Amino acid sequence: MNRIRFISLILNLDSCDSNIQEYSRLAYVHDLNKLMDENFVSLLLIILKLAKNSKRLQPTYHNVYLFNLLKSYALSEIDGYVLGHFSRGFVNTLMHYKNAQYETLESLLSANNFFEANKFTQQILLELAGEQSKQRNWMYFTDVHSINHQSVSDLNHLWELYSQGNFGFSIQKRIWISVNKNWKKFWKKIGWINSNSKWLKYPGEFMWAVNAPPGHLPLFNQLRGVYVLEFIFDYYL
């Protein structure tokens, strides 16, 4: 497969390949590392521009990966284009998120700074839940009703995209359902408790990398009860 065909396939610009599944495309994307050189980077930038101009560029796992791969090459042409057209972040630019804090969150996730991204996510949720939640720095189970559905969906979307589908509330919900909503099994499955059913110590014993167990992040304090997270699973996703 030649390089133009390869990238067009990944970006879903070729309609005859539109039925290829997301993870199949992602497998192709990872193979790009074997082809990368300065000429190929320039070609990738051209196709990115074409995709954005045609309004066919979508915030998907593979496109997020490609965009980050492109940014990793310190070329003035790339830096100029990214600054001029994606200054709010790749996903924020395409999705037109209204909450400016999501730009900061996307920047942290894009840099694989999952520790700070987790803290910032909790901060956003507390602010969305209301001033009292923010002041006390945790939520009562009644506070979660103040958070609107779209905000949770947007947060979840960013986590999913920048972890290639490994993190996010929707991933956690899927695992929770897979263990018949048994919380202890859920916590063990996502790596919040150890084999002796003891809670991991924050922050040192948790994993802050994309290869952590599925659903490991973002963290949610379960010592105050499961209602808030259960409410998010049941009503927001």
UniProtKB/Swiss-Prot annotation:
Signal peptide: none annotated. InterPro entries: GUN4-like, GUN4-like_sf. It is found in: Plastid, Chloroplast. It comes from the Eukaryota. PANTHER family: TETRAPYRROLE-BINDING PROTEIN, CHLOROPLASTIC (PTHR34800:SF1). Its main location: plastid. Belongs to the ycf53 family. GO terms for molecular function: tetrapyrrole binding. Gene3D superfamilies: 1.25.40.620, Gun4-like. The gene is ycf53. This is Uncharacterized protein ycf53. GO terms for cellular component: chloroplast. It comes from Cyanidium caldarium (Red alga). Keywords: Chloroplast, Plastid.
